[in-house]
């Protein structure tokens, strides 16, 4: 297993106008992250990859393409979580066979699962695959909140490495870091990189890193070095960019920014809006000129 600390892009996926996977474009996005953004790794199959609108076979195809293009140049994490446990296991086995360094799985959602059911879900994926696991906690989308003691229960399984922490509860983040110093935490909110890094997170996984990965690393490393003033200046610029991206449409705007750099980033998958309006394309060009030139 490679070192899983550091800056990981939550990988975007390029789709054709008919919704099919654009393999050429996906390969270009992988290469852009490696060659231009200089990320430490990729988090494949997450929310940014429009994962929860895809079939099992499409998810496998994305895992295959990303691994084939990245090879062993960087670390790879496969997000295999699903409300269907058997699908999660099938995906986990496939990604493990491909050589992914660790699995990750979003907490099972929609139904109000009990904590014992959630623990069984993670333990089952690990037992079936033999791979490592990173809990993906994103309570504002799943409605699932896991407390400090419950994380301790999950961490009793030695294959659970830590958590992708996509939440604004920095008190919980600090408590987890103190209670379980040997387990890793990846910050999941790009706009809060500095405060997360100041609390000692081990890395970050972000959607905007596909185009803003260099600044993300600067914030992370400056904060680790105690250079908070310099880190804050870069966080301010980063958040100005993120504010513009969010106002314009998160995934489509990041894809447009990639297109402006020659990457065939494609469309989004319906029922999301497939492409930006001309006005929003023009705004993306303004963001590119102001923040990414």
UniProtKB/Swiss-Prot annotation:
Quaternary structure and interacting proteins, as annotated: Homotetramer.
Function field: Catalyzes the reversible aldol cleavage of N-acetylneuraminic acid (sialic acid; Neu5Ac) to form pyruvate and N-acetylmannosamine (ManNAc) via a Schiff base intermediate.
Pathway: Amino-sugar metabolism; N-acetylneuraminate degradation; D-fructose 6-phosphate from N-acetylneuraminate: step 1/5
One GO MF term attached to the UniProt entry: N-acetylneuraminate lyase activity
Residues reported to bind aceneuramate: 47-48, 136, 166, 188, 190-191, 207, 251
Protein name: N-acetylneuraminate lyase
Use of this protein: Although equilibrium favors sialic acid cleavage, this enzyme could be used for high-yield chemoenzymatic synthesis of structurally diverse sialic acids in the presence of excess pyruvate. Engineering these enzymes to synthesize structurally modified natural sialic acids and their non-natural derivatives holds promise in creating novel therapeutic agents.
Top EC class of this enzyme: lyase
Family note: Belongs to the DapA family. NanA subfamily.
GO cellular component: cytosol
GO biological process: carbohydrate metabolic process; N-acetylneuraminate catabolic process
Active site: 136 (proton donor), 164 (schiff-base intermediate with substrate)
UniProt cross-references to InterPro entries, sorted A to Z: Aldolase_TIM, DapA-like, NanA, Schiff_base-form_aldolases_AS, Schiff_base-form_aldolases_CS
Organism: Pasteurella multocida (strain Pm70)
Keyword terms of this UniProt record: Carbohydrate metabolism, Cytoplasm, Lyase, Schiff base
EC number: 4.1.3.3
Localisation per UniProt entry: Cytoplasm
Recorded catalytic activity of this chain's protein: aceneuramate = aldehydo-N-acetyl-D-mannosamine + pyruvate
Source lineage: Bacteria, Pseudomonadati, Pseudomonadota, Gammaproteobacteria, Pasteurellales
Effect in UniProt of substituting residue 164 to A: Binds substrate but is unable to form a Schiff base
Keyword Lyase listed: yes
